Amino acid sequence: MDGNPCWEQFLNQVEWIARANGPVVGFMNWQSVVNNAYRLRGEELFPDMISEPDRVKHIFECVTQTMIEGMRRLYERQKASGVELTHATISNCLVNLLSPEMYEEFVLPYDRRVAEAFSMIGVHNCAWNADPYVPHYARLPDVAYMDMGLESDLERARAAFPTARRALMYTPMDVKEKTLAQLTADLERIAGEYGPCDVVFADIDRGVPDQRIHELIDLCERISDRSAAVATSPT
């Protein structure tokens, strides 16, 4: 990595933060092995898994080593500034383009290596149905965060990751198009089948009226308060 222009530019930004702020506080999104490999190989990555599996494994090996080394170097610099981080995150935004069998064969071994290199791991899936991959994710060590979409089997996911911080990625289309009754039903289901958890309302379109945002906040507060009261009430 030494001498690589992109890495040197990144380190220069880190040093600028240190000079301006002292502690280097922040979290780098390292994407994931499959996301980064796609940026390098493009759509050919997927047919390569059938016709050129050794090429795919070589790319994944290079990406994995680079991610782990980059995280370690950044964390060493942050620790020197007084900020200690020990976790890793992977953003498997493209995982739904793989069958669960191909994920298990090609990607899981490298996701596992990233997880094993750090104290805990968080896994981001966008708003996809994560059901085909949950059994494989459950084989990763020390999963501390997991998110997925509403079409997933939420009860099964909660059982697979009982101690992880769970999040539900709620789509901006649903935020904009669903009725208040439908939103209420969704959030009630999320709380009952997946909670305690976070709900992520990402990428909200500017055309969504403020009233809808207030409705979402009110719903989350009301359901959260009720769930907390039930959890703390004497049996």
Regions found by a protein language model. Give the residues of each.
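Active-site loop segments of alpha/beta catalytic cores
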Residues: 1-235
